[in-house]
Amino acid sequence: MGRGKVELKRIENKISRQVTFAKRRNGLLKKAYELSLLCDAEVALIIFSGRGRLFEFSSSSCMYKTLERYRSCNYNSQDAAAPENEINYQEYLKLKTRVEFLQTTQRNILGEDLGPLSMKELEQLENQIEVSLKQIRSRKNQALLDQLFDLKSKEQQLQDLNKDLRKKLQETSAENVLHMSWQDGGGHSGSSTVLADQPHHHQGLLHPHPDQGDHSLQIGYHHPHAHHHQAYMDHLSNEAADMVAHHPNEHIPSGWI
């Protein structure tokens, strides 16, 4: 018993409509392939689904060649030169076809819409993905090596800087220790020791100057703390002057002022 005739109208059920589209699309693509193979015909088939997805078949090596041949076959021979807007429209169609083809390829790479693909097309897609993965891994490894090299260079720079800072710190610490030792030993309790070690100098520290008639004190040895002695002597002179001012009738030894 043969199949009954199918009423040619839009299928309202969405799932049934998609199933019917897939079956008839595959059949149409198969017929186009058989026609080109059996009859040596140049066949180009372009199908857009209800959701705008592109399905195409071309018996030639490139769909664009067939489309260009179709465009050149102008049915109106009297109008050989197409208007500019027609040329632009044809260019738009080419670009649109190219974009839709790339979108379909992208979906296939993402694992979508693989149903219409044949075994050979699936193998080609698999090989393409494997090649892409190899290139991605190679680039990733190279980026990691470059990053590791940069980190090692920065580490070496930081080590050199740390070495210089440590050296400067040691030099500064040595200078501070020497300075503190000098202050503790020579600035406070060590002044007498320094003077005792140099008797031929400190004997003239409090010796009166020979050119002066009075007995004013003179500093004959320039010690690092000589300004402390000078300040002390100035203090004594000021006290003597105050005593003369407050007690003018009392006798003050001449060596005090």
UniProtKB/Swiss-Prot annotation:
Quaternary assembly: May interact with the K-box of MADS6, MADS14 and MADS15.
Covalent S-S links between cysteines: none
Gene: MADS1
Domain K-box: 85-175
UniProt keyword annotation of Flavoprotein present: no
Residue intervals of the MADS-box domain: 1-61
Pfam families: K-box, SRF-TF
PROSITE patterns membership: K_BOX (PS51297), MADS_BOX_1 (PS00350), MADS_BOX_2 (PS50066)
An annotated GO BP: specification of floral organ identity
Expression across tissues: Expressed in lemmas, paleas and pistils. Weakly expressed in carpels.
Null mutant phenotype: Homeotic transformation of lodicules, stamens and carpels into lemma- and palea-like structures.
GO MF annotations in UniProt: DNA binding; DNA-binding transcription factor activity, RNA polymerase II-specific; protein dimerization activity; RNA polymerase II cis-regulatory region sequence-specific DNA binding; transcription factor binding
Physiological role: Probable transcription factor involved in the development of floral organs. Required for the formation of inner floral organs (lodicules, stamens and carpels, or whorls 2, 3 and 4) and the lemma and palea (whorl 1), which are grass floral organs analogous to sepals. May be involved in the control of flowering time. Seems to act as transcriptional activator. May act upstream of the auxin-responsive protein GH3.8.
Record keyword DNA-binding present: yes
Protein name (database record): MADS-box transcription factor 1
